A protein has these predicted regions:
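Short, flexible turn/loop "capping" segments at secondary-structure junctions
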Residues: 32, 64-66, 121-124, 181-186
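Well-ordered beta-strand positions enriched in small/hydrophobic/aromatic, beta-favoring residues
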Residues: 39-41, 129, 165
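Short, well-ordered beta-strand elements within core beta-sheets of diverse protein domains
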Residues: 70-79, 126-135, 190-194
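Hydrophobic side chains in well-ordered alpha-helices
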Residues: 51, 141-145, 201-205
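Conserved PLP-enzyme active-site core in the AAT-like
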Residues: 1-100, 105
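PLP-dependent enzyme catalytic core of the Aspartate aminotransferase-like
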Residues: 135-137, 163-213
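Conserved small-domain helix->loop->beta segment predominantly found in fold-type I
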Residues: 89-150, 154-159, 173-180
Length: 213
């Protein structure tokens, strides 16, 4: 089983790669507007009957409005994911050229670990990626950087039309993923690139960097 939310369920063909069950938070890219809570599961013929039986036994169901809204979102999924890919890659390329940035973790960039696997297995990228700063932001710098964006909003969820930002410190990541091979030293910034003008998003990030010089 795999969580296929980052790829919107379509940028990575899970069942074609031998995976039995592909799940995703439809709340994100399937719906596309961050206004419905729904999850989906797709299975191959070998596991579908058992999955469906468990779903019935647990009484899982979704209301009609959520089902309709999700179905409507799926109609524009391909167009939206294409825009997420193009916009996020443009921002990622710009970030990779900034002196404050140590590394950009966007799988479509050749410099990103796992890029070859991405090229082999995926048909595109979504809007979610992260970048690491050369330094660890102290509390004052973190507040100056994160609290004053014009377009980016601090929020955990993603997959909608809006651009979002979060920060995690290296020690926080180490606690969450103690077995990670690539050890972080600087602050890690997570971005979700939505449908705002990319030049304006870049200007917003540049203003953030200017605040921590």
């Amino acid at each position: 089983m795999i969580d296929n939310t980052w790829a919107g369920g379509v940028l990575f063909k899970a069942l074609e790669h031998g995976i039995d069950i592909s799940i995703q938070a439809g709340t994100k890219y399937l719906v596309g507007h961050s206004d419905i809570m729904i999850g989906t599961a797709v299975a191959n013929t070998r596991t579908w009957d058992k999955l469906r039986e468990h779903s019935y036994l647990m009484g899982q169901m979704v209301d009609a409005d959520s089902a309709y809204t999700t179905a409507r979102g799926i109609r524009t999924l391909g167009v939206r994911l294409k825009q997420h890919h193009e916009s996020s890659l443009k921002v990622a390329k710009w970030l990779s050229e900034q002196p404050q940035v140590k590394a950009v973790y966007h799988p479509a960039l050749p410099s990103c670990p796992g890029h070859e696997n991405f090229k082999r297995d995926f048909t595109g990228a979504s809007g979610l990626f992260s970048f690491e700063l050369h330094k660890r932001l102290n509390d004052e710098e973190l507040s100056a950087f994160m609290d004053n964006f014009e377009l980016f909003t601090m929020a955990y969820s993603w997959g909608g039309f809006e651009s979002l930002i979060l920060c995690n410190q290296a020690e926080e990541i180490a606690k969450i993923r103690p077995g990670i091979e690539r050890k972080l030293t600087g602050s890690l910034i997570r971005l979700h690139i939505g449908f705002e003008d990319t030049d304006e998003l870049i200007a917003d990030l540049q203003a953030g960097f200017d605040r921590i010089k």
